[in-house]
UniProtKB/Swiss-Prot annotation:
Top-level taxon in the UniProt lineage: Eukaryota
Organism name: Botryotinia fuckeliana (strain B05.10)
Main function: Part of the gene cluster B that mediates the biosynthesis of botcinic acid and its botcinin derivatives, acetate-derived polyketides that contribute to virulence when combined with the sesquiterpene botrydial. Botcinic acid and its derivatives have been shown to induce chlorosis and necrosis during host plant infection, but also have antifungal activities. Two polyketide synthases, BOA6 and BOA9, are involved in the biosynthesis of botcinins.
Gene3D superfamilies registered for this protein in UniProt: NAD(P)-binding Rossmann-like Domain
Protein name from the UniProt record: Botcinic acid biosynthesis cluster B protein 16
This protein's UniProt keywords: Virulence
Protein's pathway: Polyketide biosynthesis
Amino acid sequence: MALEAAKALQQLRTGDLNAFNFVYISGEGATSNPGPFTPLFGRVKGETETGLMKIQSKVANFRLFIVRPSHVDSKGHKAIAPYIPQPTVLLRAANLALGPALRGFLKPYNSPTAPLGEFLVDLATGAQQGRLHGDGVECRGASTIISNVGFRRLMGLS
């Protein structure tokens, strides 16, 4: 789906003054160099990232931002509660067991939805321009990959 959208956006004219910011939400664990023990999601997300970077390299005014959140945590975010599907029993149990640890002492692996949503909108609108450097931010050509650590640092959560 993301690749098809990006391919459609290849029609952007190179002479347009404004660049188009394309934000792809990937995930921690995505890799373009999978090994024998890489989970399927890491392999698929990595392949998608690679495909998007190839498209980006052909269109000068197409800016690609890849964000790799970790445990996406909606706890306490009442505004989106009505839109979150009911979790399965297994997912509910995992959140009950791991959620407090991820919010407590494993914060680098937690992605609270309110600041994550704000960050994604900031990327799309260009509000993060000039700030995308440092720990957790990797530039590959004209593409920018932001890990969960980078997102948390840029949003003042670390």
